[in-house]
């Protein structure tokens, strides 16, 4: 029996595939390669190039493979883009998940671990955020992810699907082997953007807003190493395979850093001055997001290994020095 990883050529998906295969699991990857990279897929994984909105392609996969569980990363995930092009997010995230769940139900696959987001909370009423805190998304991306959670809940009631939704905070870092790391085109995540400056690919870092109600006026986020995140997905899947009920877990380190603090850490790690300039706020950005992951630690037995931002940034820097253009040559 195999694990199907949808979006397994993307950043978090590819790291999860590596962790699964290192643990001796059989893995099937499906990705449309619109934002993922074929080179990021572990060579021992079976690969299908398909879009989850293509039900015929999904049906063919489920008929051909013996799938015992699904890990679902296939979604659009840029906050800013979701505000300017919300229909893309409803199409890819909601419609795509609807097609996937329909195919799973028809083929008797009833376990799914789902990549949700801290953006489901919106502007939190308290930090650290707990799983039962209010979910009032401030951007379309978070709204579609929350709707995906609700969709799984109703499909569970109707068809017996069992699911775990993992609400991530800021994934970062690279695989310890150096084989894979973070690569987006164009790049949208803070740490890779910062590291483009010492690579000579960017003159300065833009800090979007310095007037938030935080200690230095810049947004606070909770950063989590991508391999810790990958391990949490495997633990969540095993929780379902061992009879666990539907559940939602936060994943983070429980410690927040401002944008300016992340820039300072990157300066220390790289030895580069890394100029920064202030830009207007981005629509939909909450002032701070910090997770309580106590529930995942207690229920799943999750033990993050990388809780030091310097170590996380150093792993990302090692990847970018050896792969300055990501998975693309030139």
Model-identified regions with their sequence ranges:
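Hydrophobic, Gly/Ser/Ala-rich alpha-helical and linker tracts in large acyl-processing enzymes
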Residues: 176-187, 196-197, 203
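Oxidoreductase cofactor-interface core, primarily capturing Rossmann-like NAD(P)-dependent enzymes
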Residues: 161, 177, 206-207
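N-terminal Rossmann-like NAD(P)+-binding domain of SDR-like oxidoreductases, especially those catalyzing
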Residues: 1-174
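C-terminal substrate-binding subdomain of Rossmann-fold SDR/epimerase-dehydratase oxidoreductases
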Residues: 193-330
